[in-house]
């Protein structure tokens, strides 16, 4: 069985509107659920196939914002959004990482999304090519997006190929003043909102890469991330010994 909980956010006039959520399996079966804007849509699907490194099964969710018809007029779809997702569990214990209850030995690399002579603005096809190199040529099962959230196309490819992703808040070594930290916290929130539907993402980077310790600030980044996603653990990358874990 696969449990799900669908949260939505809207902007604009939505009084009287309702939601319709449709989940489609890879085999084409459909399940439709209706709900209200103020509450999450929850449910359980039977016979789901979990997302894993060996079998990265993806389901498709389409959510529609509907204004009910009046005076004999039909309902009207005001907006809709389609995303892919997967059913899986991730847990770190003393013995290591467990994906869907099975222990996984991580073999991964750090990845920058810049290319010689072209920089960062590369098409989706090259983002996918990098993911294929990581999985099929290098034999890796994990990647760290060092050290910033990367192209949605790269995460899509990791979802499809079965690559675990450690994605991080942007930054490198530097910690700034209070306005800088306020923006960094917003970056953390945006990272979670942008990436949390990707089943490949198993770890949030809540620390600026290679930065000095700042217990109060990193407590806030952890809280900001876990407020939006309590299901995934957080981590941080270090360059010096005897530093705090976060």
Where do the model's predicted regions map?
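Hydrophobic residues in well-ordered beta-strands that form the structural core
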Residues: 165-167, 236
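Active-site beta-loop-alpha junctions enriched in small/polar residues
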Residues: 111, 148-150, 170-172, 207-209, ...
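Secreted/periplasmic carbohydrate-active enzymes, especially glycoside hydrolases
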Residues: 1-152, 156-165, 187, 202-203, ...
């Amino acid at each position: 069985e696969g449990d799900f909980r669908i949260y939505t956010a809207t902007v604009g006039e939505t009084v009287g509107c309702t939601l319709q959520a449709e989940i489609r399996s890879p085999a084409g079966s459909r399940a439709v659920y209706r709900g209200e804007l103020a509450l999450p849509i929850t449910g359980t699907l039977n016979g789901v196939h979990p997302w894993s490194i060996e079998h990265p099964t993806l389901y498709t969710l389409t959510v529609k914002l509907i204004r009910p018809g009046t005076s004999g007029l039909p309902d009207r779809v005001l907006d809709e959004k389609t995303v892919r997702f997967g059913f899986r569990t991730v847990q770190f214990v003393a013995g290591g990482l467990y994906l869907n209850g099975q222990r996984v030995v991580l073999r991964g690399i750090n990845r920058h999304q810049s290319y010689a002579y072209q920089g960062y603005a590369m098409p989706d096809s090259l983002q996918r090519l990098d993911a294929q190199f990581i999985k099929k040529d290098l034999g890796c099962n994990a990647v760290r997006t060092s050290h910033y959230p990367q192209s949605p196309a790269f995460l899509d490819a990791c979802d499809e190929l079965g690559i675990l992703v450690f994605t991080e808040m942007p930054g490198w070594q530097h910690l700034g003043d209070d306005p800088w930290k306020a923006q960094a916290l917003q970056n953390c929130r945006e990272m979670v909102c942008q990436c949390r539907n990707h089943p490949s993402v198993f770890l949030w980077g809540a620390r600026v890469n290679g930065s000095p310790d700042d217990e109060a600030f990193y407590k806030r980044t952890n809280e900001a991330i876990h407020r939006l996603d309590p299901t995934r653990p957080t981590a941080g990358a270090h360059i010096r010994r005897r530093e705090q874990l976060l």
